[in-house]
């Protein structure tokens, strides 16, 4: 297995698909990395030479990926919550941020329904 940006890239996959195992790299960016480094994106990871892997590591190093990207996203959300803006408040309450309805739906964001307790007479 090839190791790029601290992630093991599966050997059996094409280079373009294998690079998407790295957090922060999707199909488009993976393809652009392959083109910039001169590596064929249809080549299997197991067929890459050490020189190819080094070129890929160099290109991936130009982007914010993995732990740094996760930290950056978390800090951005924390900043919104500290500001107390609308989006920050919605993050804090665990509700949708972008104007979706919440009277019904929004179950993914709100979590499972809480059962209503029956009133005693």
From Swiss-Prot:
It comes from Burkholderia mallei (strain ATCC 23344). Gene3D superfamilies: 1.10.8.50, 30s ribosomal protein s13, domain 2. Keywords: Ribonucleoprotein, Ribosomal protein, RNA-binding, rRNA-binding, tRNA-binding. Located at the top of the head of the 30S subunit, it contacts several helices of the 16S rRNA. In the 70S ribosome it contacts the 23S rRNA (bridge B1a) and protein L5 of the 50S subunit (bridge B1b), connecting the 2 subunits; these bridges are implicated in subunit movement. Contacts the tRNAs in the A and P-sites. SUPFAM superfamilies: S13-like H2TH domain (SSF46946). One of its GO terms (cellular component) is cytosol. Pfam families: Ribosomal_S13. This is Small ribosomal subunit protein uS13. GO terms for biological process: translation. PANTHER family: 30S RIBOSOMAL PROTEIN S13/40S RIBOSOMAL PROTEIN S18, SMALL RIBOSOMAL SUBUNIT PROTEIN US13M. Belongs to the universal ribosomal protein uS13 family. The gene is rpsM. Part of the 30S ribosomal subunit. Forms a loose heterodimer with protein S19. Forms two bridges to the 50S subunit in the 70S ribosome.
């Amino acid at each position: 297995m090839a190791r790029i940006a601290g992630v093991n890239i599966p050997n059996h996959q094409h280079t373009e698909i294998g690079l998407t195992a790295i957090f922060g790299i999707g199909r488009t960016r993976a393809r652009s990395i392959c083109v910039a480094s001169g590596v064929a994106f249809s080549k299997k990871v197991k067929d890459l030479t050490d020189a190819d892997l080094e070129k890929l590591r160099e290109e991936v190093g130009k982007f914010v990926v993995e732990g740094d990207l996760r930290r950056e996203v978390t800090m951005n959300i924390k900043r919104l919550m500290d500001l107390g803006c609308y989006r920050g408040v919605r993050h804090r309450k665990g509700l949708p941020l972008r104007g979706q309805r919440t009277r019904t739906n929004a179950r993914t964001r709100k979590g499972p329904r809480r059962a209503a307790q029956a009133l005693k007479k």
